[in-house]
Amino acid sequence: VLRSLHAHAAGWTARLGYRISVYATPSESLTDRFCRLDRERFGAVPDITDKDYYTNSFHYDVRKSPTPFEKLDFEAEYARYTSGGFIHYCEYPVLQQNPKALEAVWDYAYDRVGYLGTNTPIDRCYPCGFTGDFDPTARGFACPSCGNADPRTCDVVKRTCGYLGNPQQRPMVHGRHAEI
């Protein structure tokens, strides 16, 4: 699909005289909206429209639980077709006690990908003092220690479409939340 989009963009550039490119990090809401529209049109197709979201950009499907190295190897070949922009990113557990693990991924990525984002859990619950990764729930995120989900007394930080944000304060679309 990306090769075809890239070829079409090159053809339009040649024909129109304007630089046309493929941007591989689309609007986060499209991962939800397009899946809903396709499910309405084609029904629940196993592993495609039955999971409430489309995987963003050319990212490795999160349901497969790849290692960071597998994810980077899988995604590396696609960036060449997306001259309008792209991002690779990897999710990690709490690595404060093991920074060498994070450095190993950065070293591995250095010659393989052009832009790498790093996501490590930094959620915080003020009532109980928990710091780490909050649990996703049907309505947002909750502290795994005490169950707190009050946006006034906790801070949740997640990366959405390459940007860090607080989904407790500004909830993400259903499809993106389902993917997480």
Give, region by region, the residue ranges found by the protein language model.
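Long, C-terminal-biased catalytic regions of enzyme "large/alpha" subunits
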Residues: 1-180
